[in-house]
Amino acid sequence: MKFHILAVGNKMPDWVRKGYTEYCQRMPKEAELLLVEIKPEKRVGSKNTRQLLQAESERIRTVLPPGCHIVVLDETGKQATTMKLAEMMDRWMGSGQDVAFIIGGADGLHQDIKQMAHEKLALSAMTLPHGLARVLLAEQLYRAFSINRNHPYHRA
C-alpha cells in the first residue's frame, strides 16, 4: 500500500527535504511514502484567491491517484492523537486502498478538494508552514506504523 502526500509548493528549504527524506526512507515498502509536489499558482495580475485555489485544485486532481482514500490536512479538521492515527493507519492498511494526504498551499485548499475528501485531519489547531507539515506528517506516519508493529521507536 502507498501513502501519497500531495503538497502544494515546490521550492522547500533544505531542512524540509532532509526531514521528509529521513522518515520516508524509514518506512517499509509495505507502507511506502510518496511525495508529489504541486506547483503553486502564481500571484499575478488580477487573479483573486478563489481563482488561485481553483487552479491549484485542478493540478491536485490531475495527480490524485484513482481510487484512493483522500485525507485533507486542514487546521479545522479532526485532531487525533498519535495512537488514534495508528488506529486509522491500521484501518487504512486493512482496506488495501492507497491513501492520499493533501496539503494546501499558502491560501489553503479549494472547497471542492475539501468536499471530495473522505476525512479531514488537523496536525495542529495552529497554522503550520507547509514544509513543516510535510515533515510532521511523515514522522507521525512512521510513528503510527512503528506503534502498529511494536517497534521501539515510539516509547510513550
Swiss-Prot record:
It catalyses: pseudouridine(1915) in 23S rRNA + S-adenosyl-L-methionine = N(3)-methylpseudouridine(1915) in 23S rRNA + S-adenosyl-L-homocysteine + H(+). PANTHER family: METHYLTRANSFERASE, RIBOSOMAL RNA LARGE SUBUNIT METHYLTRANSFERASE H. Homodimer. InterPro entries: Alpha/beta_knot_MTases, RlmH-like, tRNA_m1G_MTases_N. GO terms for molecular function: rRNA (pseudouridine-N3-)-methyltransferase activity. Belongs to the RNA methyltransferase RlmH family. Specifically methylates the pseudouridine at position 1915 (m3Psi1915) in 23S rRNA. GO terms for cellular component: cytoplasm. S-adenosyl-L-methionine binds at residues 73, 104, 123-128. It comes from Nitrosomonas europaea (strain ATCC 19718 / CIP 103999 / KCTC 2705 / NBRC 14298). The keyword Methyltransferase applies. This is Ribosomal RNA large subunit methyltransferase H. It is found in: Cytoplasm. Gene3D superfamilies: 3.40.1280.10.
